[in-house]
From Swiss-Prot:
This is Trigger factor. Pfam families: FKBP_C, Trigger_C, Trigger_N. GO terms for molecular function: peptidyl-prolyl cis-trans isomerase activity; protein folding chaperone; ribosome binding. One of its GO terms (biological process) is protein unfolding. HAMAP family: Trigger_factor_Tig (MF_00303).
Amino acid sequence: MSVKWEKQEGNEGVLTVEVDADTFKTALDDAFKKVVKQVSIPGFRKGKVPRGLFEQRFGVEALYQDALDILLPVEYPKAVEEAGIEPVDRPEIDVEKIEKGESLIFTAKVTVKPEVKLGDYKGLGIEKDDTAVTDEDVQNELKALQERQAELVVKEEGAVENGDTVVLDFEGFVDGEAFEGGKAENYSLEVGSGSFIPGFEEQLTGLEAGAEKDVEVTFPEEYHAEELAGKPAVFKVKIHEIKAKELPELNDEFAKDIDEEVETLAELTEKTKKRLEEAKENEADAKLREELVLKASENAEADVPQAMIDTELDRMLKEFEQRLQMQGMNLELYTQFSGQDENALKEQMKEDAAKRVKSNLTLEAIAQAENLEVTDEEVEAELTKMAEAYNMPVENIKQAIGSTDAMKEDLKVRKAIDFLVENR
């Protein structure tokens, strides 16, 4: 095999590959063995047609495509390795010369990973946020725990207040006409939750059980139902019942109900403080790492290929789908509800995708510049951590992953971020 790499404009180039005649002959032989199984010629059983007769009847050209299908998946990666390039998308392959008894020549137009010119990435001067937890933070968290344990109690008298839950009937009208999805009976709504159209919930405050009211609102311009977006509407509302939150008393009994590992409110308070400190520490660490990576990336120069952005967009969309599934939704339902199709979602994600790709390229370049390497022991430690997380034997994890090359790259990128933190 002979390989020639010609760099063109931007990150594109052409790989010219010549495969020797013997290798091409072997591919033609294998192609014939495959094709002949499907060929019937009078006087011969299927699969038993002689090669000479086959080529006489159909021409050797009938084997070329199958030979290429056998050859290219093997020879193209070899050529890429020999040329020392890193393609980031599928190649556009053209066959320049194909003839029995001769060498095969093909070209592959590819987009390769760009070179990164690093700017400043040490001494960036970014400080970690303060992680101190105040008594007020702890009290607010305990109050939130109280809120989550609150019971709804029917108000025998009095009007709707912010935070109350009302049971109501409503029917909406636009231009005097009822619209689909605008009617409900005995609907429970927490006033102040922001669940309804802006302005709706505020107009319920001050009403008493049994009250009826015309609530006038305007649908937001970006409302998911286009036929309603930006239009004024009137909702005829009837209040059946008002429920107020009744908070449990903040005492030792409350503490034991919340956490069976504590006996007193003082213990719960201390445990809550430690949990908040840990959460703040993790949040500050994550923010610091993110800001350092972003700054180093902004200081670097790289012509990011669209192919890499498109790949990242696809990955981000899959991540988004997985999050939706965890919430009991899917992408189709989401697009119906939000009024956005897949292309609109990708358009929203495009800027973040480009930043992610450039950040990753920058971190790879930093790892190379600082000679950061990942040892076999570090890979084993990561595999062990995964095995513990999934409660599986390490060998099963290894079989599922196959090659650890991607894991090594991820660990190397992580080391580059650690380097930024240590040298900020």
